[in-house]
From Swiss-Prot:
CDD domains: cupin_HGO_N
Annotated positions binding Fe cation: 341, 347, 377
Protein name, per record: Homogentisate 1,2-dioxygenase
One Pfam family it belongs to: HgmA_N
HAMAP family, sorted: Homogentis_dioxygen
Catalyses which reaction(s): homogentisate + O2 = 4-maleylacetoacetate + H(+)
Higher taxonomy: Bacteria, Pseudomonadati, Pseudomonadota, Betaproteobacteria, Burkholderiales
Active site: 298
Entry cofactors: Fe cation
EC class (word): oxidoreductase
Purpose: Involved in the catabolism of homogentisate (2,5-dihydroxyphenylacetate or 2,5-OH-PhAc), a central intermediate in the degradation of phenylalanine and tyrosine. Catalyzes the oxidative ring cleavage of the aromatic ring of homogentisate to yield maleylacetoacetate.
GO biological process, one term: tyrosine catabolic process
Organism: Burkholderia ambifaria (strain MC40-6)
Any one of the GO CC terms: cytoplasm
Keyword Iron included in the entry's annotation: yes
């Protein structure tokens, strides 16, 4: 039996966020009433995968039990992957990253590769903060690929991967089952989970936030109430599916920002059954229940929060994943686009589709921008003039768009690649230079 990545998945999904799931690809493969029986059904091995400390509070504890044909330890020793290293996971003062400028930064999309390039080969780190070794902060990567991973499997020991496809579907085989992900959806692959990516559409491009710290969770809703934003039922986790395949395969690991490879004689997608709450999942951003003002003013962008990684300071997240989806704007006598802003947090933005309502041009799908701590940003000159003269007595729908933001509590440090690449727009600052002076002390 194999996990055929050439066609869409058929096993289906389990609904809910971080639920206590139980699923089996063969009847009776899950042990009854215990996790580690003396002899597991079908001659399987029982293996626990822990995503948090054993002693984490029950409400935060994440782990799963896997019942597999061979344990994960069965592979040859790892050795470093040779060739250029485009991944970075250390962003402290001693890290090999250049000084972070206070300038607003913006990039054109990552070009598609000319040579055959799979998902792992197409990764490049644009920015980040903290340290993978210290398990805090994040790295922000882009990917551009044009071929499926062939007899090759990958996992990151550095953090969980929040994948935001911009172009091309991803058929992702994991130890837990299949995830089929398309643009407008996201996928989260937990730290340590082995996976492989097939590209059914050929070219694929997108964004990744690799979270080194506390696991992503749904935010509390406060006075919004018991429903709204990203609803738990819309998160989908794969049902168990396995393959029993032997051959000359390669296992690639990411540890402390470095890639390592090992020979492995079988597919690691040999989990016949599993139960627990530590597993991959996907979410359709088009299902986000957008909240907004129906009187006046533009609320803070925290109303667009999908997922958060909490810090040790209450109310201050290490990472926020925020989206700006299609929505109605109805506020009267209000400047409706996102306002001019300086932020104690740092903001890395991407665009999946369409246009962003604060930028008339220059910010295109697949591109990115970075506005670091206290760097002034906001609508460009054309957007400001149009929005200042628009009729706000009528509602307006912002359509054909899907922008997002990775917002962090600490400085986002661009890598040497990000500052040297030809995709960096040297003239980004010009979009604000045409903003005119309107001040007249004689006219209120």
């Amino acid at each position: 039996m194999t996990l055929d990545l050439s066609t869409p998945a058929t096993a289906g999904y389990l609904s809910g966020f971080a639920n206590e799931f139980a699923t089996e690809a063969l009847p009776g493969a899950l042990p009854h009433g215990r996790n580690s029986p003396q002899r597991a059904p079908y001659g399987l091995y029982a293996e626990q995968l822990s995503g948090t400390a054993f002693t984490a509070p029950r409400g935060h504890n994440r782990r799963s039990w896997l019942y597999r044909i061979r344990p994960a330890a069965v592979h040859r020793p790892f050795e470093p992957v040779t060739g250029p290293q485009r991944l970075v996971s250390e962003f402290g003062d001693s890290a090999d990253v250049p000084p972070t400028p206070p300038n607003q930064l913006r990039w054109d999309p990552l070009p598609m590769p000319v040579e055959p390039t799979d998902f792992v080969e197409g990764l490049v780190t644009m920015a980040g903060n903290g340290s993978a070794a210290a398990m805090n902060g994040c790295a922000i990567h882009l990917y551009a690929a044009n071929r499926s991973m062939q007899d090759r499997f990958f996992y990151s020991a550095d953090g969980e991967l929040l994948i935001v496809p911009q172009q091309g579907r991803l058929f992702i085989a994991t130890e837990f089952g299949r995830l089929d992900v398309e643009p407008f959806e996201i996928a989260v692959i937990p730290r340590g989970v082995r996976f492989s990516v097939a590209l059914p559409d050929g070219d694929a491009r997108g964004y990744i936030c690799e979270n080194f710290g506390a696991l992503l969770r749904l935010p509390d809703l406060g006075p919004i109430g018991s429903n709204g934003l990203a609803n738990p039922r819309d998160f989908l986790t794969p049902q168990a599916a396995y393959e029993d395949r032997e051959g000359a395969f390669e296992l690639v690991a990411k540890l402390n920002g470095r890639l390592w490879r090992a020979d492995i004689g079988h597919s690691p997608f040999d989990v016949v059954a599993w139960h627990g709450n530590y597993a991959p999942y996907k979410y359709d951003l088009r299902l986000f229940n957008t909240i907004g003002s129906i009187s006046f003013d533009h609320p803070d962008p925290s109303i667009f929060l999908v997922l958060q990684s909490q810090s040790d300071t209450p109310g201050v997240d290490a990472i926020d994943f925020v989206i700006f989806p299609p929505r109605w704007l109805a506020a009267e006598d209000t400047f409706r686009p996102p306002w001019f802003h300086r932020n104690v947090a740092s903001e890395f933005m991407g665009l999946v589709h369409g246009a962003y309502d604060a930028k008339a041009e220059g910010f295109v799908p697949g591109g990115a921008s970075l506005h670091n701590c206290m760097s002034g940003h906001g609508p460009d000159a054309d957007t400001f003039e149009k929005a200042s003269a628009s009729d706000t007595t009528k509602p307006h729908k912002v359509d054909a768009t899907m922008a997002f933001m990775f917002e962090t509590r600490t400085l986002i440090r661009p890598t040497r690649y990000a500052l040297d690449t030809a995709q960096l727009q040297a003239d980004y600052f010009e979009c604000w230079q045409g903003i005119r002076k309107h001040f007249n002390p004689e006219q209120q």
